[in-house]
Amino acid sequence: MSSLATLLVLSDSRLPTGGHVHSGGVEEAVSSGLVVDLATLRAYLTRRIRTSGLVTASLAAAVHRGSLPAAAGEAGDAETDARTPSPAARAASRAQGRGLVRLARRVWPEQDWDGLGATPHLAVAAGVAGRAGGLAPDHTALSVVYTTMTGSATAAQRLLALDPGDVAAVTFALSPLCEHTAAEAAKELADLSDPLLDVLAQRHLERERPLFAS
């Protein structure tokens, strides 16, 4: 498989990694009246791409390059924890990382996945998977940023009963931002945070019978 095809597959929302049960805070944002239509969804996605998307992608790119060790308990793990203030967001990250590793074991069995531990962060797992798949670090970053956007967009589509074509048009419009963010993420580790996204992640835990895990 070519590196471009691998990039497309890793960015496919149909991958059985468990990502479809996470909304990236959109469910809580919808419940709180922060995301109510296409315009507010676009604003939310833009904010998420520029913050958590950038940070997660920068960690994945660093793991891919080898500048952050991927082994459980090493710098990759610690740096991701340090950049994820919300315990709920950390748990969601590790759940998605576990799902990605479960699939990656089948695709690249020669890779040492055991060294990542039972619940690696998504950024760490994505970095190792991108390297195993022969991607360049910036393409690994792009797959992370893109799925950060599309996961939340699809969740909002379901929660607000939005027209799928309209939501797709929003993601097309934000594609240049995804590319720019991935390029920035591949340069160096990002260390910003977004208190709103952290609050939404924590408040989601208190919601009764949520549709999404996060």
Curated annotation (Swiss-Prot):
Its main location: cytoplasm. Residues 83-95 have a biased composition (Low complexity). One of its GO terms (cellular component) is cytoplasm. Gene3D superfamilies: Urease accessory protein UreF. It holds the Pfam family UreF. GO terms for molecular function: nickel cation binding. Residues 70-95 are annotated as: Disordered. InterPro entries: UreF, UreF_sf. It is found in: Cytoplasm. Required for maturation of urease via the functional incorporation of the urease nickel metallocenter. HAMAP family: UreF. UreD, UreF and UreG form a complex that acts as a GTP-hydrolysis-dependent molecular chaperone, activating the urease apoprotein by helping to assemble the nickel containing metallocenter of UreC. The UreE protein probably delivers the nickel. PANTHER family: UREASE ACCESSORY PROTEIN F. This is Urease accessory protein UreF. It comes from Mycolicibacterium vanbaalenii (strain DSM 7251 / JCM 13017 / BCRC 16820 / KCTC 9966 / NRRL B-24157 / PYR-1) (Mycobacterium vanbaalenii).
